[in-house]
């Protein structure tokens, strides 16, 4: 990681943020950094995260924000369990942002998300960001391979699979983020528009 960031820095493109791991609810680098089930000791995971963070800081210092990211954004008990665990091992993890994945058909209601964002931003004194989210604008099969978004997902998600339904979801999500106390809600990243099978997208048309 340090070498990669040094390459970026040498080209004058220091990243605004670095996410250490992706959806790390079950840890990283199994089995050494695994957590959950029979793996109840966070020490090795915290040490791995600490080393990765140290590499980022050694390269780009504090100008780059560091994100720790879990899935299941409406599950407050998961976030308390995980962040209590990794911050309670004596490593004083130097991170700036808690990143969450949130899909309403899988991860609870907007109220669940709001509660979690409010709680963890205050409990850990960190900014929060939705680093992965999306909602379907159609139930149609766009590429002949079947749709990953079903009528059942639409029902659970609570918004029509339409352009307006997608817009309403994003508007409501924005409101939830803006309502986090102390301006701790930073925004969201949408996942992932390059997988829409438009003309010229080789994977979807060839």
Residue ranges and their predicted role:
Residues 83-148, 160:
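Flexible, glycine-rich surface segments
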Residues 64-65, 127, 187:
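Proline-centered loop/turn at the N-terminus of a beta-strand
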Residues 1-88, 93-95, 108-117, 199-206:
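Active-site cleft segment of glycoside hydrolase catalytic domains centered on the general acid/base Glu
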Residues 18, 98, 132, 166, ...:
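Conserved, mostly hydrophobic/aromatic
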Residues 66, 97-99, 154-158:
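A generic short-segment signal for beta-strand/edge and adjacent turn/coil regions
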Residues 37, 58, 119-122, 138-206:
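Aromatic-rich peripheral "rim/lid" segments of glycoside hydrolase catalytic domains that contact
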Residues 20-25, 69-73, 100-105, 133-136, ...:
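Active-site beta-loop-alpha junctions enriched in small/polar residues
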């Amino acid at each position: 990681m340090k070498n990669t960031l040094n390459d970026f820095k040498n080209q004058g493109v220091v990243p605004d943020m670095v996410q250490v791991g992706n959806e790390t609810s079950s840890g990283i680098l199994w089995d050494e950094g695994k957590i959950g089930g029979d793996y109840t000791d966070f020490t090795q995971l915290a040490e791995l995260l600490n080393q990765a963070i140290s590499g980022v800081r050694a390269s780009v210092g504090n100008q780059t924000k560091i994100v720790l990211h879990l899935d299941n954004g409406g599950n407050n008990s998961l976030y308390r369990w995980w962040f209590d665990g990794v911050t309670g091992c004596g490593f004083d993890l130097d991170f700036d942002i808690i990143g969450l994945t949130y899909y309403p058909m899988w991860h609870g209601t907007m109220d669940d998300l709001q509660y979690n964002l409010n709680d963890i931003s205050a409990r850990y004194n960190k900014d929060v960001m939705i680093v992965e989210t999306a909602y379907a604008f159609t139930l149609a099969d766009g590429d002949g391979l079947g749709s990953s978004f079903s009528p059942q997902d639409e029902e659970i998600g609570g918004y029509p699979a339409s352009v307006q339904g997608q817009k309403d979801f994003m508007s409501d999500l924005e409101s939830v983020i803006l309502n986090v106390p102390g301006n701790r809600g930073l925004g969201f990243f949408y996942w992932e528009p390059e997988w829409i099978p438009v003309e010229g997208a080789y994977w979807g048309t060839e």
